[in-house]
Every structure is written in C-alpha cells, then in structure tokens.
Amino acid sequence: MEPPIQTYSPEWDEARKTRLGASDMGALLGVSPWDSPADVWASKRGAGRPQSDGSINTPIWWGHQEEPSIITAAVYEIVGEIDLPHVLTGWSWVIDGLMVSPDAVLTDEQTDPVDIPETLHALVEAKVVGLRSGYLWRLGPPQHVLAQAHTQMAVTGAVRCHVAARIAGAPVKVWPVDRDDELCAGLLNVVEQFWSYDDEPPHWEMLVEPVVRGL
C-alpha cells in the first residue's frame, strides 16, 4: 500500500480517475438507493456522468459543511471528554484500483499519517441524512454505508469504523462497526473483478451476492 495522500490534492485528483472509491461500493453491490452497478461502470469505464459544478446550497455541499461538527460530536460520544484520541482528517489511502478517504482517523498518539498503520485506533464516517432518507437508518447504518465502512477498513487496516449520522436534524448518533475480515476480503475481490472486465458482465449480480449476504 502506498503512503496516504492528502485528500483533494493534485495527487488525489489524479489517483481517483483510475480507482474506485469506498462510496462506490454500495452501488457496485447493488444495495445503493441512488446508483446502480451500471452507473459505476459508466463513471469509471465508460463515458461517465456529468461532474459536479461545485455549486453551493446542495445536499452534498451541506454535508461537507456539517461534517466537522458531526466528527466532533462522534468523538465525544465514542470516548468521552477524557483521554480524547488524536483525530486526523483529510487523508486518503490508495491501493491498486481503489482509494478510500475516511472522514476521520482516530490514532492512539500524535503521529505522521505515514505511520498510521502502527497507531491507528479507528475510523469515523460522518453522514448527514435528510428526512426523506431517514427510514433507511431505522435499524442502523444501511447496507451501502456498511459497504463503505468495511471497504475503508479493508484498505487502512482499521479494526473498527464508527458510523456517525445526523438524521433529519436530530442529535448525532454513533454506531460502531467492527471489522469482518471475510467481508473485507470479499469487497477487495469485487474491486479486482470490476477492473478485469471492460463492460458490466451479465453475471455480476451472482458474483457480488455472497458479499451482499455478509453486510
């Protein structure tokens, strides 16, 4: 695995052109409420979808604005006021065909991001959930979010990802998601299979079905 790179840097922008992201995995597995495997193929292997024009006052823009506050609330919820871990944000990890950008990384000691594998404590994934999507969270993080969390753990080596969500303006709620090595391996295999085809194969649903069962 290559050393982590700064999110939104020129290196990050170049790397994402030829790699899937953790947020693509839900769609690739067919469990995303918004995108399908075909959308991922079009985005990464085909003509692609229109890119965001950077407009403000959109759901994505607001998500980025609220993210730091959600992380702060989540860390307090996770460990309390005493013995707060060191929180690192703005870093991405890259492997062949895949790049993950956790919203926050909790480490046991202050460290350079390059040394994180030895000191990493857990990840935090922050979500802003609107009123209309709140039903997806009635039993906890939905499958597409679990796929994202496990993909991040698969690449970083973390053993836990705390999914923190602010649903319909309510206080932040945190769900700890523990690493499942079998699921992580299955997700990495899905990434490998994705890049081995030029077009979406007709049997793709059968290929990913064992991984979906593990979510």
What is each model feature region?
Residues 68-72, 150:
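A structural signal for well-ordered alpha-helical segments within the folded catalytic domains
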